[in-house]
Swiss-Prot record:
NCBIfam families xrefs: panB, PRK00311.1
Its job: Catalyzes the reversible reaction in which hydroxymethyl group from 5,10-methylenetetrahydrofolate is transferred onto alpha-ketoisovalerate to form ketopantoate.
Keyword Magnesium set for record: yes
Active-site residues, Swiss-Prot/TrEMBL: 178 (proton acceptor)
Keyword entries, A-Z: Cytoplasm, Magnesium, Metal-binding, Pantothenate biosynthesis, Transferase
GO molecular function annotations of the record: 3-methyl-2-oxobutanoate hydroxymethyltransferase activity; magnesium ion binding
Main EC class the enzyme belongs to: transferase
Catalysed reactions, as listed in the record: 3-methyl-2-oxobutanoate + (6R)-5,10-methylene-5,6,7,8-tetrahydrofolate + H2O = 2-dehydropantoate + (6S)-5,6,7,8-tetrahydrofolate
Protein name per Swiss-Prot or TrEMBL: 3-methyl-2-oxobutanoate hydroxymethyltransferase
């Protein structure tokens, strides 16, 4: 996959993007043939035990990005710039974006709208592709006052559209639309020449992204309306561990076939 191929998919073929935070997951996604692997700062919620993406550091992102690249050597990987790794300084923002590219990303994702255009253009000038992200932006959780759908009021719709157009003009190759009304997502998708990728943004985006853990049911108690659980992996893994525990306790594991004998194989 390349940026050029992603751009050509608009209005032709739906783009599939899924998160990964480690090598085994990345291997599964590459085998499945997803179009884009996202190393999201959502690793904070899904892997590191944080209650939001805000505590995630650049160093943590790099460690997980490296693991994903090792697991999916041939995939197109986008990595998030985490909170406080960009925005306060153009130079630091571009440097940190470059570190993600150096460590295995094909592109970086930056949350926010027109306010990031100077950073985006500086990144593009030195060869760093950028994916935009508007709507509900998790790093701004405290500003939103919680996980709230965006774009319900006319003023909010206008702001979303203005930011989408500004990002396209800045040179991003695609935009994630998160937790916005289906109507504004449809309008944005129709007015942009670059692909939109939705998460909780309805049926009319050019692609869809979901968190791996939500797809496979690793946290079955978390059931956001916009997501879908395709398997209950939590129960499968729990049953496996319980069986192992039981066999150790009743001394049926290890069995003869699991041990080494003198003169044997």
């Amino acid at each position: 996959m390349t940026i050029q191929k992603i751009l050509k998919m608009k209005n032709k073929e739906k783009i599939v993007m899924v998160t990964a935070y480690d090598a085994p997951t990345a291997k599964i996604l590459e085998k499945a043939g997803v179009d884009i692997i996202l190393v999201g700062d959502s690793l904070g919620n899904n892997v590191l035990g944080y209650d939001s993406t805000i505590p995630v550091t650049l160093e943590e992102m790099i460690i997980h990005l490296q693991a994903v690249r090792r697991g999916a050597p041939n995939s197109f990987i986008v990595a998030d710039l985490p909170f406080l790794s960009y925005g306060y300084s153009i130079e630091e923002s571009v440097k940190n974006a470059g570190l993600l590219i150096k460590n295995g990303a094909n592109a970086v994702k930056i949350e926010g709208g027109a306010q990031n255009c100077e950073i985006i253009q500086k990144c593009l000038n030195i060869g760093i592709p950028v994916m935009g992200h508007i709507g509900f932006t998790p790093q701004s959780l405290n500003m939103f006052g919680g996980y709230k759908v965006q774009g319900k009021e006319e003023s909010a719709k206008k702001k979303l559209l203005d930011n989408a157009l500004a990002l396209e003009n800045c040179g991003v190759f695609s935009i994630v639309l998160e937790m916005v009304t289906e109507s504004i997502a449809k309008e944005i998708t129709e007015k942009l020449s670059i692909p939109t990728i939705g998460i909780g943004a309805g049926r009319y985006c050019d692609g869809q992204v979901l968190v791996f853990h939500d797809i496979v049911g690793l946290n079955p108690e978390f059931k956001p309306k916009f997501s879908k659980m395709y398997a209950n992996t939590f129960e499968i893994m729990l049953n496996a561990i319980e069986k192992f525990k039981m066999e150790v306790k009743d001394k049926t594991f290890p069995s003869k076939e699991n041990v080494f004998e003198e003169g044997g194989k």
